Amino acid sequence: QKWSGILDLRPKTVYMSFGTFARAHMMPAEYKNTIRNAARAFPDVTFIWKYEKPEHNASQGIPNLIESTWVPQNDLLRDSRLSLFVTHCGQGSTTEANYAGVPLVVVPVIFDQVRNAFQVKKNGLGVILNKAELEKSHAFENAIREVLHNPEYKQRAVAAAAMLNEKPFTAREIFVHNMEFLAKHGPLRQLDHYGRKLTFIQYYLIDVIAVVALSIILVLSIVIY
């Protein structure tokens, strides 16, 4: 009931979470100010901010900015009243958003998040914001405005979710089919990967490394002497 009431407060709702690695309370002050300024710039939009330190009073004085140490993320994403998800683009959060049909503003920080963000942009499911741009209020606000006001992002997100949720086969059916195939045809040499038969030297390219290392040593010896 609490979250349903929050979603009913205004015509649009934006949920912001940057995962467990990039915690909101550890953000530079400039980044936090950018988020607060964005909420002020969209007074008719409710902003839900996953923020781990309530004693910071990060949302003080901004009625449409609601901070919470915990958010039922998957349930929130699957509610049709949610308009936009601002995320670090981790694999889990991105997958949940894609299955729920929610458009994104992604701020990748590390590792696979950059690749995930590229896929989001490539498929037209949202826009990418470089984390350094969080210092600029106008850049963050423009990204939010682009996704909120351009219905094509929502349309593509819903279409992608429809395809993801309509699986031609369940995991159980695939497993049973593969087991029946294996029982009927037995071990298949054609699928036996040759790589698993490589020797230690071949697998780690020790012979190649040795040749390169010796060549470098030889060249250095000639140059030095």
Model regions and ranges:
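A donor-sugar binding/catalytic signature common to diverse glycosyltransferases
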Residues: 69-117
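Hydrophobic, well-ordered secondary-structure elements that form the walls
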Residues: 35, 47, 76, 86, ...
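Conserved catalytic-core segment of nucleotide-activated headgroup transferases in glycan assembly
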Residues: 1-61, 71
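Short, conserved active-site loop motifs that form the nucleotide-linked donor/cofactor pocket
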Residues: 45, 64-66, 82, 126
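Short loop/helix-cap segments at secondary-structure boundaries that form the rim of catalytic
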Residues: 55-64, 77, 96-97
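C-terminal amphipathic helix plus adjacent low-complexity
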Residues: 137-225
